[in-house]
């Protein structure tokens, strides 16, 4: 009987893990949709990116790509090239945390585009432990750096419901 109860226990544990994974997957999709909606606040014409930082199922920060505070809300120059001082969504979300009483240590970042290498460095230093994204950036070096740092990286396909 011990083998049967042990096997039943294993099945029960797997079912609980599947349920937990399914719930996490549903949450990931919802937060990514919210980050996508948040990206609509960006004044950038070429690409709109949104980011949320979530800890204990609470959004503790948000950001979208754009110019620094006090600058004109124009991201591209006359040749449609992104100005060098435009901040990425991840950087905006992380710097908001720095100006608040919150901590991003152990949090999850939801970002509509996979992070570039510069943002990956900020994510690592901010103590974020998980990154969920929904669009591939042309370069994968940011994702590789996050993985090297032991950060869980998850791609969510928003085309499937």
Language-model features: where?
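Single conserved hydrophobic/aromatic residue that forms the stacking wall/gate
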Residues: 1-15
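Long alpha-helical scaffolds
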Residues: 7-8, 51, 98
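Acidic active-site catalytic centers that drive phospho-/nucleotidyl reactions
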Residues: 10, 28, 50, 90
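Zn2+-dependent cytidine deaminase-like catalytic core
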Residues: 18-26, 33, 60-160
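Short, basic/aromatic recognition patches
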Residues: 23-47
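Short beta-strand scaffold segments in enzyme catalytic cores
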Residues: 48-62
């Amino acid at each position: 009987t011990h083998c049967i109860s042990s096997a039943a226990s294993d099945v029960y544990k797997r079912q609980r893990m599947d349920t937990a994974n399914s719930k996490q997957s549903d949450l990931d999709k919802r937060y990514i949709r919210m980050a996508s909606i948040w990206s609509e606040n960006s004044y950038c014409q070429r690409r709109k990116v949104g980011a949320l930082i979530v800890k204990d199922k609470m959004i503790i920060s948000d950001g979208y790509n754009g110019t620094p505070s006090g600058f004109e809300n124009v991201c591209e120059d006359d040749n449609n090239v992104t100005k060098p001082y435009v901040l990425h969504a991840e950087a905006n979300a992380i710097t908001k945390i720095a100006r608040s009483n919150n901590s991003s240590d152990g949090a999850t970042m939801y970002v509509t585009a996979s992070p570039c290498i510069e943002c990956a460095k900020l994510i690592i230093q901010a103590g974020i432990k998980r990154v969920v994204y929904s669009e591939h950036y042309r370069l994968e070096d940011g994702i590789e750096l996050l993985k090297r740092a032991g950060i869980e990286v998850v791609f969510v396909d928003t085309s499937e419901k």
